[in-house]
């Protein structure tokens, strides 16, 4: 419902889980960004209520506009196990020091994108990992590890 704005944002009316049982399973919550993190934390709490074993939060842009206190609390209470965000936005030293936080370094991929664009090359090989996966599998099968 985009007609209501509360505290400068559209509130989430409901989260609906449509999959099979998550009981005893590790679950990954994926979103484009963490602003306050409220919706991801609500989802994590619901997954734990549904008896998920571990909950991992993964996002591209971790803004953490509401601070880290609630994430600390959820980690300490066993609701979330890890939070992963990329280094495509500034990460505070406080965030980087959290035991539950994993920094996903995207520097290599940004450099490859810039290089391809500067050489007027296609980005499709960067975006489609099939070739890289097949090469890794071939090396693995050949005994190279």
Across the structure, where does each feature detected by a protein language model lie?
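PRPP-associated nucleotide enzymes
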Residues: 1-145
């Amino acid at each position: 419902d985009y007609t209501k704005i509360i505290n400068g944002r559209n509130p989430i009316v409901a989260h609906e889980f449509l999959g099979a049982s998550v009981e005893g399973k590790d679950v990954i919550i994926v979103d484009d960004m963490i602003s306050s993190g409220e919706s991801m934390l609500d989802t994590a709490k619901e997954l734990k209520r549904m008896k998920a074993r571990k909950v991992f939060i993964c996002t591209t842009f971790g803004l953490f506009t509401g601070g880290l206190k609630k994430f600390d609390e959820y980690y300490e209470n066993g609701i979330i196990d890890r939070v992963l965000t990329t280094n495509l936005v500034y990460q505070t030293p406080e965030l980087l020091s959290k035991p539950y936080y994993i920094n996903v370094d995207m520097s290599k991929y940004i450099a490859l994108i810039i290089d391809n664009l500067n050489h007027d090359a296609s980005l499709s090989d960067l975006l489609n990992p099939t070739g890289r996966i097949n090469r890794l599998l071939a090396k693995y099968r050949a005994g190279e590890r």
